[in-house]
Amino acid sequence: MVDIATTGKPQLVVLSGPRRVGKTFLLRHLIQAIGPGISAVYFEANQAAEVAQLRRFGEVLAPALDPEDAALLQPFANWEHALNFCAATARTRPLLIVIDEVTYLMGSTTGFASIVQTVWDRIAPLANAPSLVIVLAGSATAMIEDTLSYSGALYQRPTQVIRLSPFTAAEAYAYCGRPEPEALFEAYAACGGYPLHLDAWDFGQSARENLLQLAGSPGGLLLEDAVILLDRLPDPQSRILLAIGQGRSRRSEIANEVGSRLERPLDSCLRTGFVCAIKPIGSPRKARRQYRIADTYLRFWIRILADHVQRIEGGQGEEVISHTHGEWQNQLGSVFEQAAREHAIGLVRSGVLPTGTLIDEWWTTSGEQIQVDVLGLLDHRSVVIGEAKWQKQPLGTSDAAGLWRALRYVPDPIPEPTFILWGRGGVRQDATTSHLLGFGPAEMLAY
């Protein structure tokens, strides 16, 4: 982003991502990293009225201006006035304006995105365009995506759109300083890929001790954050998330649980990245989809904490953590399976698996229920079949036999596909062959 801000050309950048993903940290780092030849302003919007927001913006802007420009600064009548003033000052000195939580301005100022569009359409085409960089950042990702859509005010206006997502397990491993791999998976299963959550996890303590402190104590970060998130979502999005997290995976099941129409609110949940729609890899485009909570932390909270918040706040956190141990192990298993798929994608990138192989999960939709954690398709044929197990004992030949059984069901397998086992305790060497690969947590997180 520093490169974007120092081109000398007008730039309109949109940065979106969920709360706690690190947007504000990144933006403040950008402000600090800008060289002395550029004036930089960081403004964090809030839920105040437009007049109050404009006054605060002027107060933040003034110290960044040259004395001559600061002397011209008057109270802004509206946001078009404010942005036009910024464009005028950027003609003599490059100016970076960062507006964080911009969706609050969209709520307090009717047509705020259209105002940005008007100012941008006026200055961007000019041969002597001002060196103004505007960065709009926000956590209400569905609202931002609406603004960027075909019918939105900023359709095709930004010079760059950056969508921040939570860390993958491998990225979290690097961020946390490469702790013991098994401990990382435990932290990730509870914290998800959010830097603030991971920073709070103490790798010098056991998983249970961390869970008691962060999730099983009144006011614990992992207990409270999801409550805040769900409270901020419009109804019925929060009820949709709870229904999906509690196992309602089909549209009809979700509708019955929520008791209202799903089209728009479910679409918003998908666009925020909290929910994903999945189907077996290789299935027809019109195949019925299932819905799943895509956010690891939110899935942890709904799966383990949602039904017990009052008990934890009443001081029964230790009992709750003990009572939900089975669900905790299921959460670890699903996180480990997703990490195996991400690792397989890395193996394709590095050339260990055939170039062009598509990786995802697969299951039968009728007849005998068969689930394959990792299936790789190349030209519509199954070339990779894998299974991931969160168990202490190293995986062996009996686990490999399960892959051979799955071979009878997967789509059009080649004669000698590559089998892969991923195990929490690794894979026994006598189980591996030239066509059966085995990996443990350390190898999975190295990608």
Region annotations inferred by a language model:
Residues 415-447:
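Domain-level recognition of nuclease-like catalytic cores that cleave nucleotide substrates
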Residues 18-40:
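P-loop NTPase Walker A phosphate-binding motif
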Residues 159-184:
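Conserved small helical "lid"/interfacial subdomain of P-loop NTPases
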Residues 40-41, 46-70, 300:
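Conserved NTP-binding/hydrolysis module of P-loop NTPases
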Residues 344, 372-392, 403, 419:
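Conserved catalytic cores of phosphodiester-cleaving nucleases, focusing on short active-site segments
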